[in-house]
Amino acid sequence: MRVKVLSRNPDDYVRETKLDLQRVPRNYDPALHPFEVAREYVRALNATKLERVFAKPFLSSLDGHRDGVNCMAKHPKSLSTVLSGACDGEVRIWNLTKRQCIRALQAHEGFVRGMCARFCGTSFFTVGDDKTVKQWKMESPGYGEEEEPIHTILGKTVYTGIDHHWKDAVFATCGQQVDIWDEQRTSPMCSLTWGFDSISSVKFNPIETYLLGSCASDRNIVLYDMRQSTPLKKVILNMRTNTLCWNPMEAFIFTAANEDYNLYTFDMRFLTSPVMVHMDHVSAVLDVDYSPTGKEFVSASFDKSVRIFPVDKGHSREVYHTKRMQHVITVKWTSDSRYILCGSDEMNIRLWKANASEKLGVLAPREKAAMNYNQKLKEKFQHHPQIKRIARHRHLPKSIYCQIKEQRIMREARRRKELNRRKHSKPGSVPVVSEKKKHIVAVVQ
């Protein structure tokens, strides 16, 4: 006689220790879960609400400067070290872990106009209103030693910006022209110029390291190649560009911060129209910096706010502001992609989280899995009206809120006027110009 018996493997359901979780048998057949999507929607809604509840982005304020913070630089090798230069010529080096100043030195008379660290992290360069370029050791001087620069170069004109090559002992300064310097020489290797207006910013490309871009006060963005003696090309915009930043992951992409409240992301091969126009600020954009991932960038504006933009979106995903923060002059995204630093003209440097609701510290494996699951749910249901409304909601200062409202009315009036003009004109006489091409005056090769 044959007898059928149930045979179970204890390893499938018995815990090894009392601390282990009970194993729950699950059947993933969709026919048994008709309300799966509805449950996921509720979970996504709750996750979105909790994200807004836990959004506490502000971490710390680094105070110590006695004048407005004019520029900042990141240490290329150390995540916890950042440098800042003020309007009174003082340079401070900060430890972000301890959130305190570890070194202060009087670098220049007048403004510190620009600063950058050497690619190996052993020294840094500063330029100021006193027409000098100075190289300083990154380490503090020993006991009894005086704080002296390694090299000092006295120029003929005021330098307004500086940036270091990503691989070689070469740096570039800008003022009346773009000068390329060797660290061992006191005169520039070559000088590049196109036009007669002063240049406010110069930046090396981190991937194609021989390329650099500059912003001039005559509304030009000029691109150069160090290997040839003449500039490559330039694009002229409606208003002046304050600074630009290259995408660290895509060699030909850069973003320009403009006086017309917008940021423009360009592909340097096709300058006739920007890849994307980023608009949300209500005053001039003064600085921009990319995330190390190249997916997002942060901008600082004269409207006393900091905004985070996805590269492929026209509007910001996040806006940071405080009651005491004044005009934000400079901004940096840390090299671990988790924090943002901004320097403003009321003498403070502020440290923010890049993701406002991110939990800091070590996460348990279950906690990490739950966060990843919630993130996927939010992405899945991000276009549902209720979830979209909660995720986009932000509290803004009254001044910014009123200016946004005013800008919206003005934009709508311009659009209406253009439609009326086209309607009452001869067909084809009033061409349709896209938002991307409206702001480009000309491209000169």
Curated annotation (Swiss-Prot):
Molecular function as annotated in GO: ubiquitin-like ligase-substrate adaptor activity
GO BP terms in the entry: maturation of SSU-rRNA from tricistronic rRNA transcript (SSU-rRNA, 5.8S rRNA, LSU-rRNA); oocyte growth; protein ubiquitination; rRNA processing
Region (Required for nucleolar location): 353-441
UniProt cross-references to InterPro entries, sorted A to Z: Sof1 (IPR007287), WD40/YVTN_repeat-like_dom_sf (IPR015943), WD40_repeat_CS (IPR019775), WD40_repeat_dom_sf (IPR036322), WD40_rpt (IPR001680), WD_repeat_DCAF13/WDSOF1 (IPR051733)
Alphabetically ordered keywords of this record: Nucleus, Repeat, Ribonucleoprotein, Ribosome biogenesis, rRNA processing, Ubl conjugation pathway, WD repeat
Pathway: Protein modification; protein ubiquitination
Ranges: WD repeats: 64-104, 107-146, 149-191, 194-234, 236-276, 280-321, 323-362
Name of a matching Pfam family: Sof1
Compartments where found: Nucleus, Nucleolus
Keyword hit for Iron: no
Entry GO terms, CC: Cul4-RING E3 ubiquitin ligase complex; nucleolus; small-subunit processome
Subunit structure: Part of the small subunit (SSU) processome, composed of more than 70 proteins and the RNA chaperone small nucleolar RNA (snoRNA) U3. Component of the DCX(DCAF13) E3 ubiquitin ligase complex, at least composed of CUL4 (CUL4A or CUL4B), DDB1, DCAF13 and RBX1.
Job of this protein: Part of the small subunit (SSU) processome, first precursor of the small eukaryotic ribosomal subunit. During the assembly of the SSU processome in the nucleolus, many ribosome biogenesis factors, an RNA chaperone and ribosomal proteins associate with the nascent pre-rRNA and work in concert to generate RNA folding, modifications, rearrangements and cleavage as well as targeted degradation of pre-ribosomal RNA by the RNA exosome.
Family: Belongs to the WD repeat DCAF13/WDSOF1 family.
Record-given protein name: DDB1- and CUL4-associated factor 13
Originating organism: Gallus gallus (Chicken)
